[in-house]
Amino acid sequence: SKDYINESHGTFIASTIQYGNKLNGIIAANSKYKFVDIVAIPNGDKNWGPTDGIGEEELMEIIEEVMEKYSSSTKIWNMSLGIESKVCDGSMSDLGIFLDYIQDKYCVQFFVSSGNLNQLPLREWPPQDDMGERDRIISPADSVRAITVGSVALYEAKDSIVRSNEPSPFSRRGPGANYIVKPDVVDYGG
């Protein structure tokens, strides 16, 4: 139902792809992109209206259906989600394995978030000893074939816990399963 749609983050990512050069003051070719807006997950943030959810199996079924319909014309996919209850612990998540399968089968590329750390204390840099593993990447950021994107701080203030160009305090870190380097890339965020 349209009542359960949160359009904030995906819209932001799409506009950054289309207009990122202009937003960052970079002169570049006037490229145009075609966007396919697939709302697979209901809104989970009560600040955006009614909330609902789906299970991982249902999400995988939706992704497979979408690939069957659009993968011949749309090759790059953004997946702005992370399953906080599934921190990378050295083994691959079911969703990470599934995304690898989908990318091979349909010759597509997924970009996924490394995930955000949403509970205090946030991580300093270098990480404090008591952080443990709770700031590790979350599913599906452990996909081997997906390009996992993390965040680095652009600015710093007198009371910042990280400096400019250090990993953002909320951005999750690798490694992935079998010590695979994750995130693959970082950009300024937060």
Q: Where would I find each of the regions flagged by the language model?
A:
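Subtilisin-like serine protease catalytic core
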Residues: 1-55, 107, 142-145, 155, ...
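Generic recognition of flexible, low-complexity loop/linker segments
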Residues: 2, 23-24, 65-66, 98-100, ...
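Extracellular S/T/G-rich loop segment that most often corresponds to the catalytic His/Ser-adjacent loop
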Residues: 129-190
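Active-site-adjacent bridging/hinge elements
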Residues: 1, 34, 75-76, 190
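Structural signal for hydrophobic packing residues in well-ordered secondary-structure cores
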Residues: 21, 67, 103, 157, ...
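Substrate-binding/access-modulating region of protease and related hydrolase catalytic domains
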Residues: 41-143
